[in-house]
Amino acid sequence: MSSTINSFDKNEIIMDRYEILAEIGSGGFATTYKAMDHSLDIPVAIKAFHKHTGASMDEAVKEAKIAAGLYELEGIASARDFFWYKETPCIIMDYVDGTSIKDYVREHGRIRGDKMLILIKPLLQSLIKIHEKGILHRDISA
């Protein structure tokens, strides 16, 4: 029986260009990996959709086009490429280095007041702009 969650192995080379470095995270729709783009010598993120989501070619292409159009929004990674690999729709996105809010809270404890506003405000402003474009984000995580 085949797995519904697609996974790439560390050091696996995708499309003769992208080397998988680590899994960044996994949500209900996809798993995201940090990878090295050996053509441009830059780190990128690869979003690989899970099979159980039933992501069709049209849906995956639509998400890639939406992500490509969000390059001007603070805190939002833009799409650089889209392809199918091992029957898996994949989006290559900007890699944004940093700590998740979840990990920050684990390490430093609860974030209070003004500090939380400073962290969240740019993301909420970008989310508002995304909604104004008619896009509903399905999987927001900390």
Predicted features along the sequence, with ranges:
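Conserved short submotifs of the Hanks-type protein kinase catalytic core
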Residues: 86-100, 104
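Activation segment signature within eukaryotic-like protein kinase domains
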Residues: 119-120
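Protein kinase catalytic-loop region centered on the HRD/HxD motif
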Residues: 124-135
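Flexible N-lobe loop architecture of eukaryotic-like protein kinase catalytic domains
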Residues: 25, 62, 71-75
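Activation-segment/catalytic-loop signature of the eukaryotic protein kinase fold
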Residues: 82
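AlphaC helix of the eukaryotic protein kinase fold
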Residues: 50-70
